[in-house]
């Protein structure tokens, strides 16, 4: 027994003691820990190492994503593009590219849009280049050996939801493809876009960012200049996100006003683009989840149980209808896993009697 806190005692069992006599009522949920247990170098740290330090994509990830350790929780980190850093580069780009006022005879729309696109290069890299790099990396993954530590434990007649993009359930254990739902995509399907992204409510992320920055001196309506005189704030981030009345903004010019607002559109489009479309995935697989009504036990192997995937687990529970009757067997590796499982149980409303832990 392992005590996670004073309220929870989570029972540990040996893998061979898990009753798997009725595979037709058993659902396996497979996460990245499954691949890693088979020697697949599929951690996000390995993905980072596959990208050259000089690559603009890696520079963008490590400099324009405002997280201390983006690789520790990579998909979650994608929700934290640094708005301020992107907006602060706008004036320099407009100046370097020599963008003229819109009423100037030599004004070039191409120069204007070229400048704003230059500022939004991080957005392009994250929405266009990142999925391509990620897929190429995924396509190269393979087990390091022929070991099959779960031989006999994985039942071919059971149901499987695979959160990985790889087919090792099939190739290593002979699980029929038709028994597996590749919930985030199958790397062998070239027409299928792999699901990658954060699961945050983008409006909530914005509110938190706005709330934590609104009182900073940099984002106040009046600022003190070098000579001690006050002036109306002309900072692009302030004008874009904190100014309450556009008509009172120190935009300096119509061209700059348009450039700031166009850049904001590109940045905010990123947040929607980078979100994991969980609802769409659920709708697309509605009939599959409806077919899980007979499932009585769920075996979770190598899944982080992060909140981004909560909707899928709630759908599993919903399909069963009788939450207290469902048994859960969840693999764990470290004390951090135990804490995550504890939080997951509380979010899902699972009783400690329903959940047992085992090691892979």
Spans of model-derived segments:
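Extended, H/D-rich, highly charged conserved domains that either
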Residues: 60-265
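Short N-terminal helix/helix-N-cap motif within the alpha/beta-hydrolase-1
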Residues: 38-39, 170
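Phosphate/oxyanion-binding active-site loops and adjacent basic polyanion-contact surfaces
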Residues: 40, 47, 57, 130, ...
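Extended charged low-complexity segments that act as oligomerization/scaffolding linkers
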Residues: 25, 43-83, 273, 349-360
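SIR2/sirtuin-family catalytic core signature
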Residues: 2-38, 272, 280-360
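Alpha-helix-centered segments that form part of catalytic cores
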Residues: 139-140, 146, 265-286
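Terminal, non-catalytic protein-protein interaction segments that mediate quaternary/complex assembly
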Residues: 11-20, 24-34, 43, 50, ...
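Short secondary-structure boundary/capping segments
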Residues: 41-51, 175-179, 315-316, 345-346
């Amino acid at each position: 027994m392992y005590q996670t806190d004073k309220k929870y005692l989570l029972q540990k069992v040996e893998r061979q003691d898990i009753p798997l006599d009725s595979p037709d009522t058993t659902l396996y949920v497979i996460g990245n820990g499954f691949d890693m247990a088979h020697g697949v170098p599929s951690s996000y740290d390995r993905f980072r190492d596959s990208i050259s330090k000089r690559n603009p994509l890696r520079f963008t990830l490590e400099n324009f994503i405002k997280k201390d350790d983006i690789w520790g929780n990579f998909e979650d980190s994608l929700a934290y593009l640094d708005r301020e850093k992107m907006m602060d580069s706008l004036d320099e780009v407009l100046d370097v590219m020599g963008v003229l006022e819109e009423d100037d005879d030599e004004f070039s729309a191409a120069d204007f849009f070229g400048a704003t696109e230059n500022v939004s290069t991080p957005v392009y890299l994250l929405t266009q280049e990142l999925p391509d790099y990620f897929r190429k990396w995924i396509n190269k993954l393979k087990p390091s050996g022929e070991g099959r530590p779960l031989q006999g434990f994985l039942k071919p007649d059971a149901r499987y939801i695979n959160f990985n993009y790889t087919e090792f359930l099939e190739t290593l254990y002979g699980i029929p493809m038709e028994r597996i739902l590749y919930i985030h995509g199958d790397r062998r399907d070239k027409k299928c876009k792999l699901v990658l992204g954060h699961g945050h409510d983008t409006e909530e992320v914005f509110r938190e960012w706005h709330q934590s920055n609104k009182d900073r001196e940099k984002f106040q309506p009046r600022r003190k200049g070098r000579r001690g005189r006050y002036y109306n704030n002309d900072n692009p981030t302030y004008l874009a996100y904190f100014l309450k009345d556009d008509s009172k903004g120190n935009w300096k010019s119509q061209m700059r006003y348009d450039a700031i607002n166009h850049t904001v559109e590109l940045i905010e489009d990123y947040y929607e683009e980078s979100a994991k479309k969980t609802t769409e995935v659920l709708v697309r697989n509605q009939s599959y989840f409806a077919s899980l009504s007979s499932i009585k036990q769920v075996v979770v192997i190598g899944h982080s149980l992060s909140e981004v995937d909560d909707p899928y687990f709630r759908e599993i529970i919903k399909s069963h209808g009788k939450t207290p009757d469902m048994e859960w067997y969840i693999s764990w590796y470290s004390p951090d896993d135990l804490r995550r499982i504890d939080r997951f149980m509380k979010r899902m409303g699972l009783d400690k009697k329903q959940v047992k832990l085992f090691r892979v």
